[in-house]
Amino acid sequence: MSCSMKTEHLQSLSLLQWPLSYVAMFWIVQPLLICLLFTPLWPLPTVYFVWLLLDWKTPDKGGRRSDWVRNWNVWNHIRDYFPITILKTKDLSPSENYIMGVHPHGLLTFGAFCNFCTEATGFSKTFPGITPHLATLSWFFKIPIIRDYIMAKGLCSVSQASIDYLLSHGTGNLVGIVVGGVGEALQSVPNTTTLLLKKRKGFVRTALQHGAHLVPTFTFGETEVYDQVLFHEDSRMFKFQSLFRRIFGFYCCVFYGQGFHQDCKGLLPYHKPIITVVGEALPLPQVKNPSPEIVDKYHALYMDALYKLFEQHKVQYGCSNTQKLIFL
């Protein structure tokens, strides 16, 4: 086996461990903890569960990040698989707080994870003095073991309490919100740039309440790494996907990429570059109780800034000159 092939297989295995680690924690580690309660080792899980109760509100109070976890070498292999990079267009001042709109959601948000939940692309060196927090579904933090793992990588709850805490305790905090949410995952097909944004205004309201700056970002290539099977709204499969979302909070998407060999289908993503372009921060005044008109004003300014960011970089990063950013 050639050296390049070994490297490629190592990158593929590193990528697979990302979702499989959660599966192992949920289906192996958690049942093991429960089983240990009925053995002489019962004090170990008992101490953890007591500590879990005492630590329950930590995800809403800034989380508990670990620089050691964020610097694991495995994230570098995931970065190199695509590869994933981050592009800074303007500096971010550590004397301010920020809400960063992450677009698009994609299927597994590889770009946002690698850029903001690890140091694989050098976020801390690119934006010195800025602490990134990527917000995700709150119920993930109710799952033992998994909650601690994702907090270590810098993820936080997308709850209002969590975001309010981060934006009101010190400066230099950046909260990344995937504004399109799980609904945007169904828009994730190659050669499309469609965002669910027109009615998503809560992040603007929160930014105004705290006087936080808004930072538009666009990740080119995020929707190119998988093909997705889309179903008609009247089909049974679409109804199942909708039911699944109501129960679990996200869609059960049917998608495929490549296998360990690029000439076969599988669940590995395609080797395509993913580039997150971080735009210039949009300053907002602090308005404790912003009116709908003020929210609409800054929401429109944000959409305009995001559109210009896309137009400025689209050809350089794989989009055609005629491709447009569509807001739904």
UniProtKB/Swiss-Prot annotation:
Sections of the chain in a coiled coil: none
Presence of keyword Acyltransferase: yes
Disulfide bond entries: none
EC number: 2.3.1.75
BP-aspect Gene Ontology terms: lipid metabolic process
Membrane topology note: Multi-pass membrane protein
Keywords assigned by UniProt, alphabetized: Acyltransferase, Endoplasmic reticulum, Lipid biosynthesis, Lipid metabolism, Membrane, Transferase, Transmembrane, Transmembrane helix
Regions crossing the membrane: 12-32, 34-53
Catalytic activity: a long chain fatty alcohol + a fatty acyl-CoA = a wax ester + CoA; 1,2-di-(9Z-octadecenoyl)-sn-glycerol + (9Z)-octadecenoyl-CoA = 1,2,3-tri-(9Z-octadecenoyl)-glycerol + CoA; hexadecan-1-ol + (9Z)-octadecenoyl-CoA = hexadecanyl (9Z)-octadecenoate + CoA; decan-1-ol + (9Z)-octadecenoyl-CoA = 1-O-decyl-(9Z)-octadecenoate + CoA
A Pfam cross-reference name: DAGAT
A GO molecular-function descriptor: long-chain-alcohol O-fatty-acyltransferase activity
An annotated GO cellular component: endoplasmic reticulum membrane
Keyword Cell division (UniProt): no
Subcellular location: Endoplasmic reticulum membrane
Superkingdom of source: Eukaryota
InterPro entries (alphabetical): DAGAT (IPR007130)
Main location: endoplasmic reticulum
Family from the record: Belongs to the diacylglycerol acyltransferase family.
Role according to the record: Acyltransferase that catalyzes the formation of ester bonds between fatty alcohols and fatty acyl-CoAs to form wax monoesters. Shows a strong preference for decyl alcohol (C10), with less activity towards C16 and C18 alcohols. Shows a strong preference for saturated acyl-CoAs.
Protein name: Acyl-CoA wax alcohol acyltransferase 1
Organism, scientific name: Mus musculus (Mouse)
Gene name tied to this protein: Awat1
